[in-house]
């Protein structure tokens, strides 16, 4: 039966039911069927849940406790699926299709889509009404049967009206967008989710809120050893996850009921962004001492959070822009490094919205101001978090041609090359990403070659997606090519890493294949460092059976043919000292 016919049938049954009730005014009422209205509100995180799954849970309203995310994940922001690490906080990034989490399947019953998984649906109530109507029309039915039928009819009508006219369920916060630390606990012991404000990528490739990461660093300071080399690199902060942050912002714009303005950081007396007095107060505070300036910066940050619907604020408060850009020059007598850190954080947070990004990218003085910030940071000891934020700002705003050109003209490539010398994973990763953004459309090729960026990338003693992409795209001098040949074993190990986790994902693996192809074509003898060549060739065959771009497919086939000819299988078996089950090559 089509929906219109079913609705007409329900209306007829309701009219007949009303007439039947009028003829039986002496019958007593029975208790109505109760509905669980808890499903009308966003579901809390399951008790005992600590790590987010990689996509919205498709489970009943009371899912069992989860300890680890599933092994599948979407390829987002430089990560791909694998089992969760053993620490309790991190969670894999969500895929772009998960920004619409919480919507019901196309053919799902509306009642169940609203969260009432255990209650009657519209079809259930229609069946109850038909049964009661049949009992009314039965001339042989006893009085008790008619009384029971009247009660069933009333229950069905009440339930049907509730399903039809009740208030819509507020949007559920996708688990991937929820903060991991701190997580408040409700009176019933369940965990309450809040929108993740500042997602960062951990070295493992998992994303958490920066608040959680900072707490973990205070409790367990540690250093990292590069995945494919033996060099230890200290971590200051993790890498900002711009893509996940954009996804959260877009989701919040569509679901303003759960925007960050509803979280605990919102002041008890909200600002009135429409009042000019608030902006004038901020500008006045900037002319005071360090404490006043810090308060002004916090007020600006609140403006980015308390605007209804998480709307971008720079379009409304244009007077803030020159203050943020020129603040240190105007009030340098009372300026401190902590204030500089807060200013960079605010600018980076403002880039969350495309409208803000476009406004910032259009500022003529921003490129020069960024270069001065880096120079001052170098004079004061190179605070790594400041440098990483600067590189992150450059990477984000370089999507606009006007900013990219100004940054290159201001010496941005040389500035970012200098950051590659700092032995800090966050700074190196962000600097490589920014260089890749400046290199868009080949505009930065000449500055990159002039400042020997490829050589500096190889001296970082680490590989990430950004570094591998740059080494693949940038022109290589004979000296750089020799250094790449020296890294042949590390490149092979990257390709052999089947889980594609950590700092190198599938995108980086494809770039590693291109670099290996160049080595094989120009000097196949350098591949002699690979002891178990059969395993590597088998891995290449496995990759060739997957869906690869045509160019990569041809490169893989050429590598297999050349290596098979240069290193016949019997010779390889004679040289190999590795166990037959070994996958990583050494």
Swiss-Prot record:
Report the domain of life of the source organism. Answer: Eukaryota
The reply to whether Magnesium figures as a keyword in the UniProt entry is no
Task: Sum up the protein's function in the record's words.
Answer: Possesses E3 ubiquitin-protein ligase in vitro.
Q: Which organism is it from?
A: Oryza sativa subsp. japonica (Rice)
- EC? 2.3.2.27
Q: Which residues form the signal peptide?
A: none
Compositional bias of type Low complexity: which residue ranges? 50-60
Database matches in InterPro entries? ARM-like (IPR011989), ARM-type_fold (IPR016024), Ubox_domain (IPR003613), Znf_RING/FYVE/PHD (IPR013083)
**Protein name stated in the entry:** U-box domain-containing protein 73
The GO molecular function terms of this record are: ubiquitin-protein transferase activity
GO CC annotation: cytoplasm; nucleus
Pfam family example for this protein? U-box
Q: Give UniProt keywords alphabetically.
A: Transferase, Ubl conjugation pathway
